[in-house]
A protein has these predicted regions:
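Bacterial N-terminal signal peptides
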Residues: 4-13
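Beta-rich carbohydrate-recognition and catalytic domains
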Residues: 18-50, 55-113, 123-253, 257-303, ...
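Short, charged beta->alpha transition segments
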Residues: 118-120
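Active-site pocket scaffolds in enzymes
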Residues: 359-360
Length: 391
């Protein structure tokens, strides 16, 4: 029995040590090939678009994004609205764009307050339904923002006339999903940064691990992060554990996964210092280490990372702060996607370089393929969402 255990452990170690990529793999060439197959998702009138999510069913992709028709970027305030776009995977064409939510919109059961409709997310609810989430935020900070959900009928290809409040569960109880309750929970654990009335988003969503639906939530202006679960009813987010240290690094916009030994690891954007990514780990998801840099990610930029696992291989995506466009700074022109069997030894599988930037991608596996959305824009801004097939 003892010998058998040793042999099994040795076999696992050898498997983890095997390279993922073949000799001579060209990550830049692989990235160029992927980008050549991308299509534009955003509608013709859209001037600014950012940070999309997607769900796939059959031969359709359902992409949610926040847009504005005024200017590039995502600083148009109350003019920010959210839509769902349906894409045919066989023809690689947009079939329809369906409005989801906008400032002060009157639904059958409630009227949204005035505010930017921001950072939409989507999940498969059941055989015939998707559920989309969106934050409605008064970005002046005068009023607490709230995250809402709205259901989409796949048979009718239409949203429900209703919209509902998402709940947040902390150690103190269950509340409307407002930033103040998220902050209060962190403050009880020693978090000392000031509270912010807006900026609470479902950021890194959604991942199925051990029968649970997990995500990383974030308050961007508040530099707050936490691992959380989505309940079976898909209407309540429950905080598992916060990771915000060191506070001077202003960690934000993280992506999380679990390593082969059971350790949780998150890669976090940093808004201070050299702005390279920091990594935090946890044995139980509740108590986390202080964020630190890792040697396999250097010269990172302050932009949203990704951390996925497809068919037993980890995919770690991060923005590189290198300059490729004359007359511009480093910007968000380079995005690296590295792969690993163990989360420790990494190889570069894709290097996306684009004069129109390559930022805030989201990757989803469906029927043996990996599809993605990504934000692009002239001069490194954000004016459109693109869609493509990674592999």
């Amino acid at each position: 029995m003892f010998l058998s255990t040793i042999l099994m452990t040795l076999a696992a170690a050898i498997a983890f040590a095997e390279p993922v990529l073949k000799d001579g793999w060209d990550a830049k060439q692989a990235g160029d090939k992927v980008m050549a197959g991308m299509i534009k998702v955003s509608a013709a009138q859209v001037k600014g678009a950012h940070d999309a999510d997607l769900a796939l069913v059959g031969d359709r992709a359902y992409v949610v994004e926040h847009d504005n028709d005024i200017k590039p970027g995502h600083g148009a305030g109350n003019a920010q609205y959210c839509v769902l776009t349906v894409i045919n995977l066989k023809s690689m064409q947009v079939e329809r764009v369906i409005p989801m939510a906008k400032s002060a919109e009157a639904f059958a059961n409630v009227k949204l307050p005035s505010g930017a409709c921001f950072v939409p997310r989507v999940i498969r609810l059941d055989e015939h339904t998707h559920r989309s989430y969106v934050a409605c935020a008064d970005q002046s900070g005068r009023r607490q923002s709230q995250t809402w959900y709205r259901d989409f009928d796949l048979r009718l290809q239409a949203f429900s006339p209703d919209i509902h409040r998402v709940k947040l569960r902390t150690a103190d109880g269950t509340f409307d999903m407002e930033p103040r309750y998220f902050h209060a929970d962190a403050a009880k654990q020693g978090f000392q940064e000031p509270a912010k009335a807006f900026g609470l988003y479902l950021l890194d969503s959604f991942k199925q691990i051990d029968g649970r639906t997990l995500l990383a939530i974030n308050n961007f202006p508040g530099a707050q992060n936490a691992l959380a679960t989505l309940n079976e009813a898909r209407d309540t987010i429950e905080v598992i554990g916060h990771y915000n240290e060191p506070s001077e690094a202003r960690l934000t916009e993280s992506s999380v996964n679990r390593l082969p030994d059971g350790t949780w690891m998150a890669i976090c954007r940093s808004e201070s210092g050299n702005r390279n990514y920091r990594f935090v780990t946890s044995a139980d998801g509740k108590t986390w280490t202080r964020g630190e840099e890792r040697p396999f990610v250097s010269k990172g930029s302050n932009s949203k990372p990704t951390f996925d696992k497809f068919d037993g291989i980890y995919y770690l995506g991060w923005q590189e702060a290198s300059k490729i466009v004359e007359g511009h700074g480093a910007g968000r022109y380079i995005f690296n996607l590295d792969v690993s069997r163990d989360g420790t030894t990494w190889e570069r599988k894709y290097r996306f370089e684009s004069n129109d930037s390559f930022q805030y991608p989201t990757f989803r596996q469906h029927d043996g393929s990996v599809w993605f959305t990504v934000t692009q824009g002239k001069g490194g801004s954000t004016d459109r969402i693109m869609f493509g097939k990674l592999e």
